[in-house]
């Protein structure tokens, strides 16, 4: 589909990204309709997908998406958790209508329910998991674009993009490549410069890991460091403050000892009292 144009050819940078994200790895099983996209079979039974055909199918899908005048008429869907973040990011940059999570049966066929939609194009992440919307789209003649693995069935699928649709990084990268190509065809971004948004923005993130990162960040801001000016104002060689309650002071000890000695010398209550009592008693008695 590149038509021999150098500007549409698969670059080495994109190939390295696909290989790093394992977008070329299929499964051990292969559907008879997907055999044409298999490059070879490894000794462990895993089928390798031909990335050149992946890129050609990606260009076809991008041209179909760019040909729709109203971007909101494009419905992107992913029931698989690894593709929900990628679907939301794709809808944010291209203006499509996302459905992340469980698909409500009858969304495309039941006009009574509030979630009823009439899209002109449907894009799904996995034909096996998203079989319900694909079946409903076939009832109302909605064309379907799907990311297909080697074991995916192509029934009711108009354009199948062969890739690894089970890996978290592979799904995010394929949605990122599709969004970038759509924006290039619309003229939003240039082909001469790289897109400012990186592929990891479309990658799946574990909610527990995100919560741990936020908690660590909050703990970091909750414990501010001591100001340098304040630490410089307090000298480090300051004399330690003694606790007066632990040991009595020298003055208190000396004062208590002197009072005790004075009290011992002036014990007039025993000596004087005895002489006075004896003298008075003798005089009165005589």
Curated annotation (Swiss-Prot):
UniProt biased composition (Polar residues): 244-270
Compartments (UniProt record): Cytoplasm
InterPro entries (alphabetical): Ribosomal_uS2, Ribosomal_uS2_C, Ribosomal_uS2_CS, Ribosomal_uS2_euk, Ribosomal_uS2_euk/arc, Ribosomal_uS2_flav_dom_sf
Principal cellular location given in the protein's record: cytoplasm
MF term (GO), any: structural constituent of ribosome
Comp. bias intervals (Low complexity): 227-241
Stretches the record annotates as Disordered: 213-286
Record's GO cellular component terms: cytosolic small ribosomal subunit
Keywords annotated in UniProt: Cytoplasm, Ribonucleoprotein, Ribosomal protein
UniProt cross-references to SUPFAM superfamilies, sorted A to Z: Ribosomal protein S2 (SSF52313)
A matching Pfam family: Ribosomal_S2
Family in the record: Belongs to the universal ribosomal protein uS2 family.
Purpose of the protein: Required for the assembly and/or stability of the 40S ribosomal subunit. Required for the processing of the 20S rRNA-precursor to mature 18S rRNA in a late step of the maturation of 40S ribosomal subunits.
Quaternary structure note: Component of the small ribosomal subunit. Mature ribosomes consist of a small (40S) and a large (60S) subunit. The 40S subunit contains about 33 different proteins and 1 molecule of RNA (18S). The 60S subunit contains about 49 different proteins and 3 molecules of RNA (28S, 5.8S and 5S). Interacts with ribosomal protein S21.
Protein name: Small ribosomal subunit protein uS2
Organism: Trichoplax adhaerens (Trichoplax reptans)
């Amino acid at each position: 589909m590149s038509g021999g144009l150098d500007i549409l050819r698969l670059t080495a940078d994109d190939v390295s990204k696909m290989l790093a994200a394992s977008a070329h790895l299929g499964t051990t099983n292969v559907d008879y309709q997907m055999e044409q996209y298999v490059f070879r079979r490894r000794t462990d039974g895993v089928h390798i997908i031909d990335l050149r055909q992946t890129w050609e199918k990606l260009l076809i899908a991008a041209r179909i998406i760019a040909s729709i005048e109203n971007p909101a008429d494009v419905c992107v869907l992913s029931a698989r958790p690894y593709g929900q973040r990628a679907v939301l990011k794709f809808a944010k940059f291209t203006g499509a209508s996302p459905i992340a999570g469980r698909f409500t049966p009858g969304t495309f066929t039941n006009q009574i329910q509030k979630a009823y939609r009439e899209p002109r194009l449907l894009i799904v992440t996995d034909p096996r998991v998203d079989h319900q919307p694909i079946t409903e789209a076939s009832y109302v003649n909605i064309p379907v674009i799907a990311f297909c693995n080697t074991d995916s069935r192509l029934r009711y699928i108009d354009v199948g993009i062969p890739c690894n649709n089970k890996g978290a990084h592979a799904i995010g990268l394929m949605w990122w490549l599709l969004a970038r190509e759509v924006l290039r065809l619309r003229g939003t971004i240039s082909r001469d410069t790289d897109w400012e948004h990186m592929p990891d923005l479309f990658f799946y993130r574990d909610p527990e890991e995100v919560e741990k990162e936020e908690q660590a960040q909050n703990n970091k801001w909750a414990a501010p460091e001591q100001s340098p000016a304040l630490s410089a104002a307090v000298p480090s060689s300051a004399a330690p403050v003694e606790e007066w309650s632990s040991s009595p002071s020298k003055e208190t000890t000396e004062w208590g000892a002197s009072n005790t000695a004075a009290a011992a010398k002036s014990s007039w209550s025993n000596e004087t009292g005895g002489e006075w009592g004896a003298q008075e008693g003798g005089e009165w008695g005589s």
